[in-house]
């Protein structure tokens, strides 16, 4: 092992005291782990990536979720309002008077 360490910038046997050449060979005999799919996918399947930025897509989704509740509440108020209260906008009655003056 001294020949192996010759020429290195630092030579200290205690740095390599736990090194065993036999352990390296045993590790290389192990078979690598392999992914085995559980489902068959058609070979014609086309993977398409979205053009929009991931961050922008996320922000749009969050905005839609946030505003969906507000929109639902607004629609509910409008439905209830139609049944009990008069409409918010009322036709102007003085518009004819203004036209007659000119």
Swiss-Prot record:
Pathway: Protein modification; protein ubiquitination. The gene is DDA1. Belongs to the DDA1 family. GO terms for biological process: positive regulation of proteasomal ubiquitin-dependent protein catabolic process; protein polyubiquitination. The keyword RNA-binding does not apply. InterPro entries: DDA1-like, DDA1_dom. The keyword Plastid does not apply. PANTHER family: DET1- AND DDB1-ASSOCIATED PROTEIN 1. This is DET1- and DDB1-associated protein 1. Component of numerous DCX (DDB1-CUL4-X-box) E3 ubiquitin-protein ligase complexes which consist of a core of DDB1, cullin-4 (CUL4A or CUL4B), DDA1 and RBX1. One of its GO terms (cellular component) is Cul4-RING E3 ubiquitin ligase complex. Functions as a component of numerous distinct DCX (DDB1-CUL4-X-box) E3 ubiquitin-protein ligase complexes which mediate the ubiquitination and subsequent proteasomal degradation of target proteins. In the DCX complexes, acts as a scaffolding subunit required to stabilize the complex. It comes from Gallus gallus. Keywords: Ubl conjugation pathway. Residues 67-102 are annotated as: Disordered.
């Amino acid at each position: 092992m001294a020949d192996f360490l010759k020429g290195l910038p630092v030579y200290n046997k205690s740095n390599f005291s736990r090194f065993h050449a036999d352990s390296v060979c045993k590790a290389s005999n192990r078979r690598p782990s392999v992914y085995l799919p559980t489902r068959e996918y058609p070979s014609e399947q086309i993977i398409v990536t979205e053009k929009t930025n991931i961050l922008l897509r996320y922000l749009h989704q969050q905005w839609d979720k946030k505003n969906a509740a507000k929109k639902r509440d607004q629609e509910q108020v409008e439905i209830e309002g139609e049944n009990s209260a008069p409409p918010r906008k009322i036709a102007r009655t003085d518009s004819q008077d203004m036209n007659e003056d000119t």
